[in-house]
Amino acid sequence: AEAARLKGRLRAWDSVAVPRWAGVPEAQCVQLGYFCMQLQAMQAAPDQPQASREADLADTRLFRQFNGFALPGDADGAPTWHNLIADLRALLLKARPQVIVLPTPLLDPHADHICAHAAVLEALQGLAWQPDTLLGYANHLHDNDRWPMGDSGAGVALPPRFDGAVELVPCSFALALSQQQDKAMALGMMHDLQPPAPFKRRVRRWLQQLLAGRSPSPYGENEFFRKAVRRHELVWVLKPD
């Protein structure tokens, strides 16, 4: 439990410290502190607190200590869906972003990502202010966690379509080499990506390099450096401007 709490505190620190590399002041960064793999249970019972599975903790406020302002959920720290929606509405009305980037369940099957998408849409319901554009991204595909294929610095191919009835509108932003390097350095600052890969994964990667000619990322050992540092960003337009 102590290791899980430490990991959460490090993630909270990373969420306010690493954006400074891109010129985003910590006053504009907020950590909500809800617990991993519990959003689905929160959504199913909106009033029922869902404690951490690993940290022996049922209070989100431990991970909000670096926030520059209070949120509605700070009143009791209860990890409930109603608190999450209230927190999101307060943030949306405070920041009033023109563009919101969020996970898209059309491609990404992660339960927390699906629920995070639903939470943002629910928080937007009934607000007089609305963003101009919603953009979706995917960290994982339903059947292939190696997407996007290829090496660091390469392009990003479109993923396979899982549902022909659903229209996906891609949007691509080019990144100069200096921007790719800045992104790689930001990823390297994230504690989640710093531990060495397990032995089995290192052996598999060595075999892939030997037999398939796959190049390791020059930026780091974690697979995310290969997948995320590319010559362009690929997102999907969920709500056009």
Indicate where each model-derived feature is located.
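Metal-dependent de-N-acetylase/amidase catalytic core
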Residues: 2-14, 21-24, 35-241
